């Protein structure tokens, strides 16, 4: 990303797709409907599986692989990429902080890539998706952190 600012947005979006902040979000059914033989009565609570939707093979090629390039030139659709909920920001319920989160992730990535040098020792970066928030086993260890001259 240091030499390709155009990779920053796809990188951040791929992190959000593969590692959503929450695995699911809850909602209340606004009006009774039926979908694939299931009845959803008005007022009932439902869960939207964010991780499952963002790794669905019907929508994503090689869905569990980290491939930021999949977001280069990708047309936005408010319903198929839903790391912080689905729908239109202006007319539906979607996380109002989503743009702030994206902006902060980009700023942090720029800082890590352009402003400091550091070493990353061998460590266990495996994530436990059953934990909230899902963190690497060793967290993330950086050594010899120094401001770039």
Language-model regions, residue ranges each:
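Conserved cytochrome P450 K-helix E-x-x-R motif and the immediately C-terminal K′/meander segment
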Residues: 2-38
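Conserved cytochrome P450 K-helix/beta-meander segment immediately N-terminal to the heme-binding cysteine loop
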Residues: 49-75
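Short, glycine-/Ser/Thr-/acidic-enriched flexible segments
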Residues: 52-53, 89, 147
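Cytochrome P450 heme-thiolate "Cys pocket" and heme-binding signature region
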Residues: 59, 72-117, 124-132
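Charge-rich, low-complexity terminal tails
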Residues: 128-149
């Amino acid at each position: 990303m240091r030499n390709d600012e155009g990779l920053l947005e796809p990188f951040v979006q791929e992190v959000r797709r593969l590692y959503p902040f929450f695995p699911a979000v809850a909602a209340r059914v606004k009006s009774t409907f039926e979908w694939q033989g299931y009845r959803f009565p008005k007022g009932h609570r439902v869960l939207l599986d964010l991780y499952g939707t963002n790794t669905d093979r019907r929508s994503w090629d090689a869905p569990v692989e980290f491939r930021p390039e999949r977001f280069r030139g990708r047309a936005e659709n408010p319903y198929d990429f839903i790391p912080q909920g689905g729908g239109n920001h202006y007319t539906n319920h979607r996380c109002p902080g989503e743009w702030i989160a994206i902006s902060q992730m980009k700023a942090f990535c720029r800082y890590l890539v352009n402003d400091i040098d550091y070493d990353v020792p061998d460590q266990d970066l495996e994530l436990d998706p059953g934990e909230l928030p899902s963190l690497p086993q060793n967290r993330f260890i950086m050594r010899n952190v120094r401001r770039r001259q």
